[in-house]
Amino acid sequence: MDYGVEDIYHYLNTTENDTYPSTMLKNMECGAAMLARHIANNDKILLVVDDDCDGFTSSALLMNYLHMLFPYFVENNIQYYIHEGKKHGILSADIVMPDIALVIAPDSSSNEYALHEQLAQQGIDILILDHHKAPHYSQYACVINNQLDDYPTKSLSGVGVVYKFCKYLDEQLDVEYADLFLDLVALGITADVMSMCDYETRYLVSNGLEHFRNPLIKALYAKTEFSINKSGGLSPYNLAYYIAPFLNATARVGTVKEKTILFESLLEFKAYDQIASTKRGCAGQMESVVEQAARNCTNIKSRQTKERDIDYELIESMIERQNLLQNKILLIQMEQGEPAIAGLIANLLVAKYHHPTLILYKMGDMWQGSARNDSRYGLEDFRQFMRDCDLVNFAEGHESAFGTQIANENIDKFIEYSNKALQDYEFSPVDRVDFIINANQLTSEFILDIGKLHYIWGQEISEPLIAIEHIAITNDNLSVIGKKEDTIKIMLPNGISLMKFGSTEDEIEALTPDTSTGCVTINALGVCNINNYNDQEYPQIIINEYEIVGRQSYYF
C-alpha cells in the first residue's frame, strides 16, 4: 500500500504539533482586523452560505464561534443569505442590502473579481475564507485562501480555513473556542472529498470524529448509527458516505425555507428553538428546529434518490442508443431533468464507465451542467483540460468536480477536440489491488490487523482492496442467509468468512456446485471487515466482485 504518507506511525498518532500557525495563511491579520472593526462599529454583516455541505458547515462554524464571543451582536447584526437552487459564490450585488457594511463569503467567491470591485466601490468590505483555486488574490477583498499562498496543508476545505481563522481569533482574544467545533470541520472536509494524507487534516478530522457536539450532526448520526457501525464504525469515509449526503441533498434540491431550517439546525443557539411542526398528523404542534431539519433531510434525500434514478435510467438508454462511449469524454445532453442532481448522476457514470463525464442541460443557446472525473484512470485535471481547449465558456470548481458551460455551436467541436487530444487514453476499468493472496494463505490475523484500521479510511487513504485467488466453494461451506436470503456466506477452513451482500438468485445459483461433491472455484476482490458478535471478533472479507474460474463435479 502506498498512500503518500512518509511515516505511518506518525500518521496514526498525530498531535496538535502537526498543525500550522494560522498566521502562515496570508491576510489572516487583515481579515481579523476587518471583522473586529465592523463588530466594534456595530455594523450590519451579511454572511453568504455556500450551497454544499462544506459551505453550510463553514458558515455554521463561524456563526457558532462568533456567538460564543458576541451573542447579542450575532443575533442582531449578522444576516445570512442562502441562494435559491444550487449556486456558489456571492453572485450578485443585488443580495446586499443598503445597510450592509461587510460581506463574508466562507467557502466561495475567491475569483469573483468584478463583483468585489463593484461592492468595494459601494463602500462595502468583503472577507473571503475559501479553499478554491483562483488565478490570483482579489484587489478589492480580503481573501484568506490556502490554495493561493504557501500554506502547507492544501487539503483543508472551506470549513478548515474558517477554523484556522477562528484559531487566530482564539489567540488574539485569549480564549479556546475553535476546537469546540471540530465535528463541523470533520464533516465539511470529508464531504468535500479532501485528501486525508496530510498530518494536519488527519489530526483535525480524527479529533472531530471523537465527539459530536453539533445538534444536527448528532441527530443525523442517531439515524445512521446502525449502518455506520455495520460498516466498521466512524471513519472519514463513513462520515462522508452516511451523513454528508443529507446536507448535500438539501443544498441541491431543497427549497430556500428547507435550506434555512437546515442551516439554523447547525447553529447551537437556534437548533433547539421551537417552531410549528410540519410532521404529518401533527398540525398545531411544536417541534425543535433540529428535529424538523433532520426529518426534512431524510425526506429530501429520498426524493433526490428517486429523481436521480429516473434520470439515470434515461441517460443509460441514451448512452446505448447514441453509442456515446465511442467518445473519450462521455457527454450527455439533456433536454429535461433536474440539473441540481447532474453531479450525482455523473459520479455514478464515472464509477461505471471510467470516462470523464459531462451532463449538460439546454439553457437557450448554451449547454450547462456538471463535470466529474476520476483521476486514477489517467486524466489528472479534467477542469484544466476543459479550460485549455478554448471551446468552453467556463469550468469552475475542483479539478475533478466542477460546473461548466459550452455553447451549442461548440459541442461537436469539443467532442472532436477531446477525442483527438485524449486519443492515447483508454479509460478502461482497472482494479488496483493492494494484496493478491491465495485463499489457503489468507489468515485471520491479516484481516483483523487491517480491519482495526477502519477509523482512518478516507480520501486518498482508501481501504485496501484484497484479491483472493482460488476460493473453493462447496455445498458444505456455502450458505445463503439474511432476511431477504440474498447474502452469500462462504466459510473457509480457517474460520474466515467471505460475505457477498445483495446477491441475485442467478448469482446464488451460479455459485452453487452442481453436485453434492462438486466445487465452484472463484477469484474475488474485497475488503477486510471485523464482525463483532457476543464480544468476539470474527474476521470477514466483504466481496465487492468476483469471477468464476472453474467448476468441477468432484472435489477432494
Predicted regions and their residues:
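Short alpha-helices
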Residues: 137-191, 397-398
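Hydrophobic helix-and-loop "lid/oligomerization" segment in the mid-to-C-terminal part
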Residues: 1-102, 122, 170-413, 439
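Active-site core of PLP-dependent enzymes with the aminotransferase class I/II
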Residues: 108-121
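Short, acidic/small-residue loops that bind anionic groups at enzyme active sites
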Residues: 124-139, 356
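Short gly/pro/ser/thr-enriched loop/turn and capping motifs at secondary-structure boundaries
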Residues: 112, 132-137, 150-151, 364-367, ...
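Short acidic, glycine-rich surface-loop motifs adjacent to enzyme active sites
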Residues: 102-108
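Generic beta-sheet signal
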Residues: 106, 129-131, 144-146, 360
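Mid-to-C-terminal polyanion-binding domains and interfaces
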Residues: 37, 41, 199, 284-333, ...
